[in-house]
Amino acid sequence: MSALTLSTQESRAASIIIKGVFTMCTAATYTTDSFYFGRNLDYEFSYGDEVTVTPRAYPFALRCMGDFRTKYAMIGMAYVAGEYPLYYDAVNEKGLGMAGLNFAGNAVYRKPKEGRDNIAQFEFIPWILGQCATVQEARTLLAHINLVDTRFSEQFPTSQLHWILADRDEAITIEAVGEGLNIYDNPVGVLTNNPPFDKQLFRLNDYSYLSPDQPVN
């Protein structure tokens, strides 16, 4: 069984994306009668990323937690190393979306800890989307998680990221930092790169004078 890849781009410079070196990324949600979740990866060339589908019951060999099979299918952008999809972002069949954004200099991952769900950074997106239908379900899992500093391989070091997780009802931001795991309610449904999310939210005050209304002459 393998992940279904939907393009045939070359895998040039793939290690850069795994390291988490980006220029500017933003993930955003939008809800009308439907729920929309998307992000941009603002680079001028491909890292070998492909539109990738992971089906239900797809096996992941988690480094600390052992065998894991997805309950829900997902689709997103990933670099596929062998048959292992390294997701940058994805949405599962229940409409739960997740994306990792650059958080260099702030992300802190820890050593495995007994009694916790020890999940590597590259395992995080499929581990959440593979078994959660909503943000609320994910909150329960996140109460027991320990994001660990395990590399995918010697060629692919750990990416320094923070994440947005969203469904049609709510969004949260997840940041592993020096003091521990911070989980923020995200009322705007948007996340970009550095700085930490609380500072991003505060900086919206700089734009409070803006309006979507047409200016009056």
Give the residues covered by each predicted segment:
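Short, Lys/Arg-enriched N-terminal segments with co-localized hydrophobic residues
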Residues: 10-23
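A contiguous strand-loop segment
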Residues: 22-117, 144, 149
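A short, charged
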Residues: 67-82, 131-136, 140, 200-217
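Alpha/propeptide regions of enzymes that mature by internal proteolysis
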Residues: 115-146
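Short, contiguous, pocket-lining structural segments
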Residues: 130, 154-157
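Secretory/export targeting leaders with adjacent low-complexity proregions
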Residues: 140-155, 162-164
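Extended amphipathic alpha-helical segments with heptad-repeat/coiled-coil character used for oligomerization
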Residues: 157-209
